[in-house]
Design a protein with these regions (language model features):
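Noncatalytic, beta-rich nucleic-acid-contacting surfaces in large DNA/RNA-processing enzymes
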Residues: 1-275
């Protein structure tokens, strides 16, 4: 999408809008390639954009299934295989979807993921600014830091998956809904406003509304409420979509499963150029 003299290239996908895209598109030329760009900010012209997962990886997985049988279709694989999680911790991640980054491997070795949700958390945290919280989440995981606002167990239930940190955008919505009594629709509006605002105007307007809702709908004491508010203020702008993180982690897990249990077929499929 394009705005004034600055434009950003985004992944391919389906764009849903009320106006014909042919009326909005223009061609841009860069590095000897043409790009079809939308010469407006995304908020001006469309409500939704659905990205497309790289098809090559899924095609390679299908090649493996064609060889080993539908019994091992990705949808039928168990998601709790200890050997697979050991592979992630070992660093042997070549050709593992989205997880073969040399800078991600040391983090996985430290975090020692033991569930698909751990993979999702690490994938989400491997972003600017969220990286600053990596030592905290590793400490929380291995030191049994379960003190996530004891006086209201619902907060613990919401934050336990991310070891007490606000990693996902969806977690923010659940906190507002369950703890402050704010509808999911209103919570999503707050999320968008806060994450777009660079002046802190929206977060300052949000805090008293959130605190009022907590006092009415939760059993948090004043200290816990202040701590939860600070967590939101400090992390909301860096949160990541759980739907994105978890879905990519599942695909990575599938790759790792085949690499562990069907190594020959995996290597053959991922070395093939016939995709």
């Amino acid at each position: 999408h394009y705005n004034d003299s600055v434009y950003k290239r985004k992944p391919c996908g389906f764009v849903i809008t009320t106006e014909k895209l042919s009326n909005l598109n223009t061609f841009l030329y860069e590095e000897q390639e043409y790009y079809l760009a939308i010469k407006h900010t995304k908020d001006e012209i469309y409500d939704s954009k659905f990205d497309l997962v790289e098809q090559k990886v899924l095609n390679r997985l299908q090649l493996i299934v064609n060889q080993i049988g539908e019994k091992y279709h990705p949808y039928k694989l168990p998601l709790n295989d200890e050997k697979v999680f050991n592979l992630f911790a070992s660093g042997d991640l070549y050709n593992i979807f989205q997880f073969d980054s040399p800078t991600l491997k040391p983090l996985l070795a430290q975090f020692k993921p033991n569930s698909i949700y751990d993979l999702s958390v690490i994938f989400a945290m491997f972003r600017p600014r969220l990286k600053d919280y990596i030592p905290t989440i590793i400490h929380n995981k291995f030191n049994g830091n379960n003190n996530y606002f004891h006086s209201d167990t619902r907060v613990y239930d919401i934050l336990n998956e991310t070891y007490g940190l606000l990693i996902y955008q969806e977690t923010f919505l659940h906190l507002l809904n369950k703890i402050a009594g704010i509808s999911f629709a209103e919570a999503e509006l707050w999320r968008r406003k806060i994450m777009r605002d660079k002046s802190n105007t929206e977060i300052n307007a949000f805090i008293p509304i959130f605190n009022k809702g907590c006092k009415k709908n939760s059993t948090l004491n004043d200290i816990e409420m202040a701590s939860l508010t600070n967590l939101i203020v400090n992390m909301i702008n860096y949160t990541f979509p759980k739907t994105h993180s978890l879905s990519y982690s599942i695909i990575a897990y599938w790759c790792a499963y085949y690499k562990v249990h069907f190594r020959t077929h995996f290597d053959k499929a991922f070395s093939s150029n016939n995709i």
